Design a protein with these regions (language model features):
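Alpha-helical metal-binding/catalytic segments enriched in His/Glu/Asp
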Residues: 207, 220, 226, 230-279, ...
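Short, compositionally biased P/S/T/A/G/V-rich stretches that sit at domain boundaries
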Residues: 25-56
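Metal-dependent peptidase/peptidase-like ectodomains
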Residues: 272-404
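Active-site-adjacent mobile loop/cap segments within catalytic or ligand-binding domains
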Residues: 125, 305, 309-327, 370-467
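Secretory targeting signatures
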Residues: 1-31, 272
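A non-catalytic alpha/beta surface segment that caps or lines the substrate-entry region
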Residues: 85, 145, 149-210
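N-terminal capping segment at the start of a domain
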Residues: 122-169, 414-426
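Surface-exposed, short loops/turns at beta-strand junctions within beta-sandwich domains
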Residues: 95-104
Length: 467
């Protein structure tokens, strides 16, 4: 239930209260939510919720119901309840409530079987979000650090695709083990187009999670390869922290968050190779026939892409301007109208659930203008809209009719260290003004992408455009 509806309920209660006792036998009994609702196994008035965490709830009594605001998500049987309302149809509902890291108050509207309502306010304090910037930074530091102690430094650098590269193979095995350890059916997909098995055209890590509906498929991914030595525009990199170790680690954290959830469609979480060589990794997955490739007999509904993460709002540049934040849905066939339903999810997540500043601008112009709406938002911090912008693996799936979201941090003139030896974790920290600032920036974009996926999964209007 949104805040306006909650306020309406409260207003009604205040208006009715002075009339109590005036109607004799018609007087209704008082509502006691604690008789039917528990949060974390205690009465609501004794509960304390934490930001960014799941909390168990129990709702008893046929016909009783609860509803929540947009930034308090309801899950039943591991599945998101999109209308934010659940009613007891039998005896008891067991579920979970998920706050965001930015939830400042928890208001639950309780309604009994007779239609009487009561507003329940639950205190909230700082928590450890299920996906968080600190975990992201720790894993980034482990992957990109090189030392003699393998418990402290993974040393998964030099992940160049193309010629035989033991460093890339070693990193792929590490990533595969992460997904397998979380219970995903995980495969390494090698595709060889030129006859030399020692030089695969692509080598992807594909993790599968079965959905309830066997007729559809959806996915999320980011590329794990980095720009090779001599690559344009900056001469290549050995660490590739921004492009795209950052997106790779976000996928590892999403896998952990999704492990106990139930999705409608079969779901793939992927780490692509050969993105820097022309999207060859995602194309190999989408266009080849194998047991763990993209199924050709199922409807591909949507795909979300993570590429170059962290250098974005709420982080600030050294000149005092916020870094631009880019998130584009697509395809955008007609710039004058909304073309795809996933755009509504994109907008709702950023501005209704996560409460990002829609109209924040800078004096002047940002330095990158590659999308078809650039003239409309050259100075807008939250560049969140429908667009055809490409340059990454979402294009592979958009070309197959899927609705897509592409998350991308600052690029070109706004942050030009990618594809260069300067693309390091230390440089990212320095550019945003500190580790905490980088963690906060990553936490926001990871929550945006995670919620987009969860909500899109339960949005039937999101269909393949060729269906």
């Amino acid at each position: 239930m949104n805040r306006q509806l909650t306020a309406l309920i409260l207003t009604g209660l205040f208006l009715v209260a002075p009339l109590a006792g005036c109607f004799g036998e018609d007087e209704k009994s008082e509502v006691y939510p604690a008789d039917s609702l528990q949060i974390d196994f205690v009465n609501p008035e004794d509960a304390e919720m934490r930001t960014g965490e799941f909390h168990d709830f129990t709702l008893k009594g046929e016909g009783n119901a609860i509803s929540t605001d947009a930034d308090v998500l309801i899950f039943v049987n591991g599945t998101y309840v999109k209308d934010h309302m659940v009613m007891v149809e039998d005896a008891t509902v067991f579920g979970q409530l998920l706050t965001t890291p930015y939830t400042t108050e928890v208001n639950i509207a309780f309604m009994d079987a007779d239609g009487q309502t009561e507003a329940v306010s639950v205190p909230i304090t700082n928590g450890t979000p299920i996906v968080n910037g600190e975990d992201w930074f720790d894993k980034m530091e482990f992957i990109t650090s090189v030392c003699t102690d393998s418990t402290e430094c993974g040393g998964y650098v030099n992940r160049w695709m193309g010629s035989p590269n033991p460093a890339f193979e070693r990193a792929a095995s590490f990533f595969q083990g992460h997904f397998e350890g979380l219970g995903y059916e995980t495969h390494i997909l090698r595709v060889i187009d030129h006859g030399n098995p020692t030089e695969p055209e692509s080598l992807n890590v594909i993790a599968w999670k079965q959905g309830r509906n066997d007729n559809c498929v959806q996915g999320m991914g980011g590329h794990m390869d980095i720009a090779p030595p001599g690559g344009p525009p900056g001469g290549g990199t050995y660490e590739g922290a921004y492009d795209n170790t950052a997106g790779t680690v976000s996928m590892m954290l999403f896998a952990r968050a999704f492990a106990d959830l139930t999705f409608e469609c079969d779901t793939f979480l992927a780490l692509w190779s050969s993105e820097e060589e022309g999207l060859r990794g995602s194309s190999a997955f989408a266009n080849n026939d194998c047991d763990y490739c993209l199924p050709q007999d199922k409807e591909l509904e949507f795909y979300i892409n993570m590429d170059m993460m962290g250098m974005s709002w709420p982080a600030y540049k050294s000149n005092g301007d916020p870094f631009p934040y880019h998130a584009w849905s697509g395809p955008d066939a007609d710039p004058e109208v909304q073309d795809v339903a996933i755009t509504t999810v994109l907008d709702d997540v950023h501005f209704n659930i996560l409460k990002a500043p829609r109209n924040l601008t800078i004096d002047g112009s940002y330095g990158a203008g590659c999308d078809q709406h650039w003239d409309e938002h050259y100075n807008l911090v939250m560049d969140v809209h429908e667009d055809t912008f490409g340059r990454s693996d979402h294009v592979t799936f958009r070309d197959l009719g899927a609705q897509t979201i592409f998350h991308l941090g600052a690029y070109d003139a706004d942050y030009d260290a990618y594809h260069s030896p300067s693309d390091t974790l230390d440089n990212m920290v320095a550019e945003v003004g500190g580790q905490q600032e980088l963690e906060q920036s990553m936490e926001f974009v990871m929550w945006a992408a995670m919620l987009e996926f969860i909500i899109a999964d339960q949005t039937p209007e999101i269909r393949n455009l060729n269906a």
